């Protein structure tokens, strides 16, 4: 598995994923966001942003096939915090790619981008993602009260019940230290 920068050659692969209801419904994507024009606009925005306010990568499987996208968004370099979102082709769920992609992206967030915390907002109806986040040993669950402004922003964006979770730098780096030493 590896993460690579956005480029226009993966437009069809992205559309194949985001056109699926189990992806675009959970992500709250309108039809204009998942057609060719909307997908191209998204990729060009990621390229133009040049990792300033968003750090987004394609997820390639062990055979270098596109299987999803992972993004650090709303990067706040003053408060050293961002929000992470990810999606993977449904037929690749349960194969460990989401965890591997998150681990790699969190490593980048904490060691290269100097962030101190990464938030995950998960819709309560997204049981699969809720359970996946509960399994992550470095995640602190249900922290909306610690980040009221960010929780309000997320609530407005999602317009439905959600849970705000966080990964703190020290927790993740300790997880890596223990994992690498075992």
Regions found by a protein language model. Give the residues of each.
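Short, hydrophobic secondary-structure boundary micro-motifs
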Residues: 25-27, 56, 175
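Acyl-donor (CoA/ACP) binding surface of acyl/acetyltransferases
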Residues: 1-12, 16-22, 60-182
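Residue-level marker of structural boundaries
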Residues: 22-23, 32, 48, 138
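Sparse recognition of residues in long alpha-helices and their boundaries
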Residues: 30-31, 55, 121, 149
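Conserved GNAT-fold acetyl-CoA-binding loop/helix
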Residues: 24-44
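A short helix-loop-beta-strand connector motif used in the catalytic cores of GNAT acetyltransferases and
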Residues: 44-58
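Hydrophobic residues in alpha-helical segments
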Residues: 18, 27, 46-50
């Amino acid at each position: 598995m590896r993460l690579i920068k956005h480029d226009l050659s993966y437009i069809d692969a992205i559309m194949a994923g985001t056109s699926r209801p189990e992806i675009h419904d959970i992500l709250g994507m309108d039809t204009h966001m998942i057609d060719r024009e909307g997908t191209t606009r998204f990729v060009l925005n990621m390229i133009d942003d040049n990792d300033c306010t968003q750090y987004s990568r394609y997820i390639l499987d062990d055979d270098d096939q596109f299987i999803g996208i992972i993004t650090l968004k709303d990067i706040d370099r003053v408060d050293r915090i961002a929000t992470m979102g990810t999606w993977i082709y449904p037929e690749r769920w349960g194969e460990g790619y989401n965890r591997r992609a998150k681990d790699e992206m969190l490593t980048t967030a904490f060691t290269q981008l100097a962030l101190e915390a990464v938030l995950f907002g998960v819709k309560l109806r997204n049981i699969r993602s809720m359970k996946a986040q509960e399994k992550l040993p470095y995640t602190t669950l249900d922290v909306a009260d610690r980040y009221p402004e960010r929780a309000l922003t997320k609530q407005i964006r999602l317009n439905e019940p959600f849970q705000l979770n966080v990964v703190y730098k020290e927790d993740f780096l300790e997880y890596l230290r223990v994992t690498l030493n075992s």
